[in-house]
Amino acid sequence: MKFPDLLRCSRAVSLARPDLPRNSPDVYDTKIPILQAITAKKCQRFRGDWGAKRKLPILKNRHISIQKFDTFEHQCAFISSDRFVRTLKRIYDLKLPVPLNDYEQISPYLLQKYNTFSSSNPKSRPTLPPGILYAKLKLLDSFSDSEKKRLSLVSFIQTKKVPLPFTYGKFAPDSKECLFGVSGVIAATSLKGITSTKNRYVIRSLNVDETGKTIPNITRENRSI
């Protein structure tokens, strides 16, 4: 197949490559997972037609990511992207608010838009378009005993270890914070509208409704809210 024909007919070739910022090459690894995923109709997947140069085996996957269009073994190298796509859909569905200082760095490269979040006065915030990133939630277990006593008198979010099917994130030991993916989204959005600063809120469990959305069960001073 000639490249012009491949370019016109291939979903994988026609995907625009993300323009990585030259001054910060690792920004995608630290802020948001980036992966190009393609899909195909069921009848095309049954034929192994994913719009690549070569046909692929019959797969149960609905999304894949092409790593190499051709190898020395005359094969098309690919990996499954189902977990990645489901994770991003869950994050977008929960509409995670974005810390303003993080958003300034990554905002030019975001595709889907949501409201930003900042604890500062709204009048002092710079005007920026909305975006989406990880939430920063302090972990109670990461503090010392004296800090735990001090924090017990103020409002904080304690995330319990619950089974989450799709979670991205990594620890930041220097700041005693954890950058959450889906779990951070759930904790952040579930406390929307709660303004009291005298209570402690704890995520006890997770439920899933008929549409597949995750609903956290939050308690306030041992009383369900």
Swiss-Prot record:
GO terms for molecular function: structural constituent of ribosome. Residues 1-84 form a transit peptide. Disruption phenotype: Severely decreases cytochrome c oxidase activity. Increases degradation of cytochrome b cob1 protein, and decreases synthesis of cytochrome c oxidase subunit cox3. Cytochromes b and c1 appear absent from cell. Abolishes growth on the non-fermentable carbon source galactose. GO terms for biological process: meiotic cell cycle; mitochondrial translational initiation. It is found in: Mitochondrion. InterPro entries: Rbsml_bS1m-like. Keywords: Meiosis, Mitochondrion, Ribonucleoprotein, Ribosomal protein, Transit peptide. GO terms for cellular component: mitochondrial small ribosomal subunit. The keyword Ribonucleoprotein applies. The keyword Mitochondrion applies. Component of the mitochondrial ribosome (mitoribosome), a dedicated translation machinery responsible for the synthesis of mitochondrial genome-encoded proteins, including at least some of the essential transmembrane subunits of the mitochondrial respiratory chain. The mitoribosomes are attached to the mitochondrial inner membrane and translation products are cotranslationally integrated into the membrane. Functionally interacts with the 5'-UTR of mitochondrial mRNAs. Specifically plays a role in the translation of cob1/cytochrome b and cox3. Has a role in meiosis. Component of the mitochondrial small ribosomal subunit (mt-SSU). Mature yeast 74S mitochondrial ribosomes consist of a small (37S) and a large (54S) subunit. The 37S small subunit contains a 15S ribosomal RNA (15S mt-rRNA) and at least 32 different proteins. The 54S large subunit contains a 21S rRNA (21S mt-rRNA) and at least 45 different proteins. This subunit is mutually exclusive with mrp51/small ribosomal subunit protein bS1m. Belongs to the bacterial ribosomal protein bS1 family. PANTHER family: 37S RIBOSOMAL PROTEIN MRP51, MITOCHONDRIAL, SMALL RIBOSOMAL SUBUNIT PROTEIN BS1M. This is Small ribosomal subunit protein L51-b. The gene is mug178.
